[in-house]
Design a protein with these regions (language model features):
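Short, charged, low-complexity patches
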Residues: 60-65, 136, 140
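Basic- and hydrophobic-enriched, low-structure N-terminal and domain-boundary segments
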Residues: 1-55, 62-74, 78-79, 84-115, ...
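ATP-hydrolysis module of ASCE/P-loop NTPase motor domains
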Residues: 123-145
């Protein structure tokens, strides 16, 4: 059995879930996407808090977008703080692109252009639903809960 086959089997066996899950993408080996080697996250392992960290250009925003889209598809509400506006495209279906089709073919997942329910909240005077309280108004006791 080749190294690639061993890797594929390791990923597919390790990503079996008894409950509901979301698929983040496909695993990579030596910089190559392994088609249908899906990376799944069981919904029961996702809690209220998470951290996605990395250097510029490593896919943090795309990871957040994929998580938000998949959770929305499962009916789970998501709150994202998007100061730069990178995730505003969630509200509109993608017009599609050859690179997107190529990437999805490598992953082994079909691409479906669709929009997601988005509610824009704001702390400033910009467009959006104005939040009536700021973080400083909550106080340390409420924030610690």
């Amino acid at each position: 059995m080749s190294r690639k086959d061993d890797f594929f089997n390791h990923i597919t066996e390790g990503n079996k879930s008894k409950g509901d899950y979301i698929t983040l993408g496909s695993a990579m080996l030596d910089g190559e996407t392994i088609t249908n080697a899906f990376v799944n996250v069981p919904l029961k392992t996702l809690n209220r808090h998470g951290l996605i960290a990395g250097a510029t250009g490593t896919g943090k925003t795309k990871t957040l977008q994929v998580l938000a889209e998949n959770l929305s598809d499962k009916g789970i509400p998501v709150l994202l703080m998007d100061i730069k506006g990178d995730l505003s495209g969630l509200a509109q279906p993608s017009p599609g692109h050859a690179k997107i089709d190529e990437r999805h073919a490598k992953i082994g997942l079909p691409f479906e252009a669709k929009s997601f329910p988005v509610e824009v909240l704001t702390l400033s005077e910009q467009d959006g639903v104005r939040l009536r309280a700021t973080v400083s108004e909550f106080g340390p006791v409420l924030l610690s809960r």
